[in-house]
Amino acid sequence: MQKTGGSTYIISLPKQWADKVGITTGMRVGIRPQPDGNLLISPNISERTPKRLVIDVTDLEGDSLEREIIAAYLAGNDVIELNSPKILADRKKVIRSVCYKLVGTEIVEETSKRVVIQNLLNQSDISVKKTTQRMFLIAGSMFRDSVKALRTSDFDLASDVEQRDDEVDRLFLVISRQFRSVVCGSGFVNESDISVDEYHDLRMAATPIERIADHAQKIARLILSKKPRYDDTTLRIIEEMSRKAERISRESVDALFSSESGPANKAIEEHADLIRMISDFSNTFRPESVDDPISLRVIVDSIGRVADYSVNIAEIAINASVAGRN
């Protein structure tokens, strides 16, 4: 460490590292301060070449084609080129559908033999905190509205809940891509108030949030397909269970973003009470007394699963809180 002038410090980069990453005299490097006080140095940040992947899709179709494109996106590729002697219409339909699921992607070139997908999103514009919070807001509203649709037999609302799951999936994939980019060293943690460890915690929490949305969608789909109707007493019990599950999820997420273990421990305690309530209901209700008892069991099970996934978030929050004290 050397000091020049009144406020400038100079450090030397290790030659072995500079040679390995190809840094030469006159090149620019990116330097970004991290919340823990460290400096993150990235070579050639201003000269980054777009990452490109070429995929032969001749033997890919349907779900396998979709999985291949999503995997390429998550791997951080900026350009995904799909080639085949002839790309049939059904494959192009799958490709367009996948592009809708991936935030920032556009088809920039399309012929009978080639489709080029480009990610136009600047990853420095993404806030993992805001993205995770938005995921939870959507998932929470989906769960709340799915139970409301059951009470009111509002099939339009149930259909809307089903469609909202796509947005949660889109946000989940963005977070996954960003996290992998940071871990692999090809991206920065852009927020000044978040460390790589916190980034990891939010990525971990995004999975149970996505599962909460899945169970809300499951209830909505059941309403649309089975159109179950239950008496007022049964509906009140379902609503009480769902309110408890929603409160547990809200407390868990609040604990995650506040880095406090108190709300998380409270959520875990309330989860135990809800599980007992669900168990008592399942053991006492008579299938012959309700319309479509199978659907009722599925709904109650999904409510319990929402609470279970919320506890997963609470446990992540507790771990993060303890780690932050070191």
Task: Give, region by region, the residue ranges found by the protein language model.
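Cytosolic, long alpha-helical scaffolding segments
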Residues: 1, 6-8, 12-326
